[in-house]
Amino acid sequence: MRYIFENGNSNGEQQKKNSKYTLWMNSILRRSKEIGKVELPICSIILDERGRCIGRGVNRRNINKDPLGHAEIMALRQASIIKNDWRFNECTIITNLEPCTMCSSALIQARMGKVIFGAYDKKRGGLGGSIDLSLSLIHI
């Protein structure tokens, strides 16, 4: 699982991919502003190997009174149904905040191919902000 967003200092193919990810990230940021009045403004999307969106999620812990109602979990649930599989080796999740330890563990279990996030979470981040669960990966 890779979780580093490459900057524009790479070859043209990588810059093209980054541009696509930037468009999705901007979409997520717009959506997070809409939900920020009711929930923690975290949104996630999952792209398949062709770059098509197969799952979307927003935080719904307060609305649903659900401790598992994190954006990443919601996106995984939707994508699992659409993909009809629990393995996401070739997929990418994009989220505006580093996934917490629970969500990071779920992404590891789902064998997510790439994780792109907008900011580290120094309090609860599971991919380097607070703790790095990816260091103990067994799924490659």
Language-model segments: residues:
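Local cysteine-cluster metal-coordination motifs and their immediate loop/turn environment
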Residues: 96-113
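Conserved small/polar residues in nucleotide/adenosyl-binding loops
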Residues: 138-140
